Amino acid sequence: MAVWALGINHTTAPLDLRGRFAFAIDQIAPTLQGLRQSLGGATRHPQVETAILSTCNRTEIYCAGQQPALDHTLDWLAHSGGVSPSLLRSHSYTLEESLVARHAFRVASGLDSMVLGEAQILGQMKDAVRAAETAGALGTTLNQLFQRSFAVAKEVRTSTEIGAHSISMAAAAVRLAGQLFEDLTEIRILFVGAGEMIELAATHFAAKNPKSLAIANRTLERGEKLASRFGGEVMRLADLPDRLHEFDAVVSCTASSLPIIGLGAVERALKKRRHRPMFMVDLAVPRDIEPEVKALEDIYLYTVDDLASVVQTAQASRQAAVAQAEAIIDAGVQSFMHWMDQRSPVGGVVPLIQQIHAQADEWRALEIARAKKLIARGEDMDAVLEALSRGLTQKMLHGTLAELRAGDADTRAQTAQTVSRLFLRSQSRSGL
């Protein structure tokens, strides 16, 4: 079994390119079905395992199959994003075998994140695994890879201080707002969306006791739940253009495939505000706010990539924790590759074990069938059991005893040592 992966992230691709490959969680299942069909045709093995991890900072595809198909996987992803394979290749990374495990373990542990040590990525990876399971795209190999990723991430977090003093994207947004506004208790803030990222951002801003807080969302029910938690109001997304001018700060993160706050709406809001400054944070990928907005005077717009310098300020002091985490990951990679080697059809013990079990089950079925016939004829039960046990013993020992008599003296001596070790283990341990 081969494993391979490819992806783009905040270090290899700009925001707008990453936006072309962002998959909402409800898109994962049909997307995986299309990917598996495509890979099945390319590799002639329809049971290819696949999973997609898609966040604001990365989109990654993990695969397992009889033979790697990196080029075909890249071509498929390029087509899905509407770009040329050459463009995607120049902004992506491809991995095979142990490098896949190392990368997955580093991602789950927060070592590959924009925010070093952040814990949110682990939950996002678990969501990706659940989506793959629901789609029927996950098999033994990828399931093992991800379960080991979760175990390694847990050990990294409990054994190191990788997450200590980690500055989240939401906390970074609060810091930037504090640089623009003298007193955050005097600002009116609007959150667009009601997902996990907005919930985190609202938690950080609410701790500063702003003058007012509002949630704009497509569905009022979800928005009301979040607004009530922070003592804010809720509004429909459709009302956003008419009310945008009321807010000093706007934080947006939705799953929309197109911008929901356009240049014209912001220009009108600024005019109504008499050009008092507005602080805007776009945490969405693809963008929620048109990029042209950033060029407007009195607008301070930040994207997830703009926040990178803020969230990385505390990372240098955690390099010792990184070294400890990498050691844990090294051990995890070795363990996973050992598991893979055992399952290899060439030199792996798992296929041999499966064959031995299958042969033993065949012999058992034959002897049970023979015993049932004897019982049906009225044979003595003790005699039937004796015949059953002898039949099984003879079948299981026949090949071994034949090997002991085959070959020259040296071959027979080596075979005898092996057979003794396998069949007389209790005697050899006791010194008999």
From Swiss-Prot:
Q: Can you tell me which residues bind NADP(+)?
A: 193-198
SUPFAM superfamilies from the UniProt entry: Glutamyl tRNA-reductase catalytic, N-terminal domain, Glutamyl tRNA-reductase dimerization domain, NAD(P)-binding Rossmann-fold domains
Q: Where does substrate bind?
A: 55-58, 113, 118-120, 124
Sites annotated Important for activity = 103
Keywords tagged on the record: NADP, Oxidoreductase, Porphyrin biosynthesis
Q: Does the keyword Oxidoreductase apply?
A: yes
EC no.?
1.2.1.70
GO MF terms listed in the record are:
glutamyl-tRNA reductase activity; NADP binding
What is annotated as the active site? 56
Please list the GO biological process terms of this entry: protoporphyrinogen IX biosynthetic process from glutamate
Q: Any extra detail in the entry?
A: During catalysis, the active site Cys acts as a nucleophile attacking the alpha-carbonyl group of tRNA-bound glutamate with the formation of a thioester intermediate between enzyme and glutamate, and the concomitant release of tRNA(Glu). The thioester intermediate is finally reduced by direct hydride transfer from NADPH, to form the product GSA.
Question: What's the record's remark on domains?
Answer: Possesses an unusual extended V-shaped dimeric structure with each monomer consisting of three distinct domains arranged along a curved 'spinal' alpha-helix. The N-terminal catalytic domain specifically recognizes the glutamate moiety of the substrate. The second domain is the NADPH-binding domain, and the third C-terminal domain is responsible for dimerization.
Function according to Swiss-Prot or TrEMBL: Catalyzes the NADPH-dependent reduction of glutamyl-tRNA(Glu) to glutamate 1-semialdehyde (GSA).
Sorted alphabetically, which HAMAP family does this protein's record hold? Answer: Glu_tRNA_reductase (MF_00087)
- Annotated protein name in UniProt: Glutamyl-tRNA reductase
Q: Which organism is it from?
A: Paracidovorax citrulli (strain AAC00-1) (Acidovorax citrulli)
Tell me the classification of the organism that encodes this protein: Bacteria, Pseudomonadati, Pseudomonadota, Betaproteobacteria, Burkholderiales
